[in-house]
């Protein structure tokens, strides 16, 4: 059993829709601050679907999904990564205003990922390209943040063993991190 799991640790997965309303974001950040003040360690994993779709459309890229996963070519990945990084920075600033010592962390800092195999749709293989799943999580990296009183705020951009960045579904990133914390 790892050290993180012996302490009270709570993982929030928050979707992009929930982050778009300033009042809701403030309430969320205040609740996180209260939890931390009571001795709970908090990890936050967030998505950004609506903002990503808007950013893609502004770049003239039509968002495409297969079985709920975003088909991610290199241009799409650049937009996804930039948008998630921006959302992350905004959330971290909001948490800091609520008294939380938060740090924005791309998923590839705490997790190794692998590229997803092509999905079968109507009998045809569809390559999702730069899309992956979490294969392992670096608990020591998370513990190091906790040891310094830092709340990790993870956005779901992973990297494979070659260092290639991958778009990871936020639910999958949260699940991978939560499983590793057991």
Where are these regions (language model features)?
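Nucleotide/pyrophosphate-binding catalytic subdomain
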Residues: 1-182
